[in-house]
Amino acid sequence: MAEFQAHINQAVKNLATLSKINQFIEDSWDWQVTTSYYVGVHIMNAHIAKMANLHYTTHDKVKNALYNQLSPAKIDQQTYLDYGKLENLSRRARYLCNENSKAESPVAFITHDVHLKRALEKLDSIMVYMAKLHSITFPVTNIDCIELKGTTLQYFKYQQKRVNI
């Protein structure tokens, strides 16, 4: 199973993929939210591998390791909630369902730029927490999402795409 650094390397690779999707694929908010979530998945799996030498394959086991009083990989409540929200935004993007997993609706819930902003805010919070905890750094990723304009995040910056005329 992958160790700490392998998960961090994959998270960084996924950040580069997020940047490329944002730059080259128009109106791809769903894929950007989903990619953001998988950056978070690898960061959390890196943390669990380092703190508890555990290697999980299900999202439920990961969440249990992150917020169980007896777990050596337990994280603070806000980071745990941010990870859960990021997961729910990804579910919405992948399955067109409501972010609230308990709500049922026949309506398709489309992912928009505002959802990417929320996903990046949650992911940024997770990255800040884990960078400090594990003394690591992540690259800053430029994202063209008007909803980010005026927002201050450590690892994500609004940058409008260049338009070739």
Language-model segments: which ranges?
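Terminal alpha-helical segments
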Residues: 1-165
